[in-house]
Amino acid sequence: MDLSTAGILLLDGVTNGAVYGLLALATVLVFAVTRVIFIPQGEFVAYGALTLALLQLGRVPGTVWLLVALAAIAAMLDVADAVRRGLRPAQLLRGLLRTLLLPALVAAVTAWAAPQKFPLLVQSALALAIVTLLGPLVYRLAYQRLADASVLVLLIVSVGVHFALTGLGLVFFGAEGFRNPPFWDARFVAGPLMLSGQTVIIFAAATALIVGLYVFFERTLRGKALRATAVNRLGARLMGISTSSAGKLSFGLAAFMGALSGLLIGPTTTIFYDSGFLIGLKGFVAAIFGGLASYPAAALGALLVGVLESFSSYYASAFKEVIVFTLIIPVLLWRSFQHGHDDEEE
């Protein structure tokens, strides 16, 4: 391997690592706030890329009807809860509007806009809106009533949600794969390296999102409420913070980050209905570096996963997935040795 080849592999690895970093941050966020090991994170990646692909073809994506169906079911559950708690009609109406209005509006706009074949950025915004709104609804229907259950129970629910979303993905998108057009098709030469415009977009989007998350958590009331819920759910509840609202918000952010990741990698690789699982698992491996608690460690782990995957594909392409996922073993052993005595004392 010469220096130019190593540089190309390193650039490719860092590019993939930037995407895995977004998924790792989403995984850490969801686990910190809700204690859910969110296996279906990768499905949001596939849904984002494939929803955009169908919009590119001028078709209404099936995720729109999934959004409407989940919103309707959530509204029925809200009505049942309101009746059981004896809420006034005005309170019930406000709750129904919060649940139904935005999904219905996004669905209507998408149904109208899909045949029009608007520019790529408009279609991308629609795809982001559709998939992002799925996140809070998934939490409301699958996890909210089990918020105080054990981590194992929540993990089992995550496995079920993963299989459900994967099966629905096959129904909505079919078995064929799609590759989306790049957001920027420019080319830049930096010595022996050829830098594509899409790579620049990936770095810029990942950096902007990380900075945005930092500002959100440090400067906004909702962000501080999420941090408080992550530190101590009971204490946050005693201070008047709604843990269910925090859970919905964390799932919404995770869905947004997953959908954005799908839009970013859609032009660089062919995405199938089940591609999100492996992509999400690589984000999970990166999150393990931070013990599902540290955002900086998860981001660094994502870069390591991306670089290792890139060099593995060069030296042993048939075993690159095995090599990447084997990385989790020494990390788990290290964390076990580091914290084992503390766990025994507890």
Residue map of PLM features:
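Alpha-helical transmembrane segments within multi-pass membrane transporters and channels
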Residues: G62-I156, V161, L300-V305, S336
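Pore- or pathway-lining transmembrane helices of multi-pass membrane proteins that form conduits
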Residues: G42-Y47, R94-A104, A127-L128, L146-L170, ...
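Helix-loop-helix "hairpin" substructures at the membrane interface of multi-pass membrane proteins
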Residues: M194-F272, Y295-L300
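Single transmembrane alpha-helix segments in multi-pass membrane proteins
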Residues: A6-L57, A75-R85, L137-V153, F289-Y295
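Cytosolic-side transmembrane-helix boundaries in multi-pass membrane proteins
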Residues: T5, A71-V109, F172, L234-L238, ...
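Short, non-helical or kinked segments that cap or interrupt transmembrane helices
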Residues: T27-A49, G62, G86-L100, D148-V153, ...
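Inter-helical junctions in multi-pass inner-membrane proteins, predominant
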Residues: D2-G13, V19, T199, F216-L221, ...
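Transmembrane helix-bundle core of multi-pass membrane transporters
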Residues: P119, A127, L141, R145-R219, ...
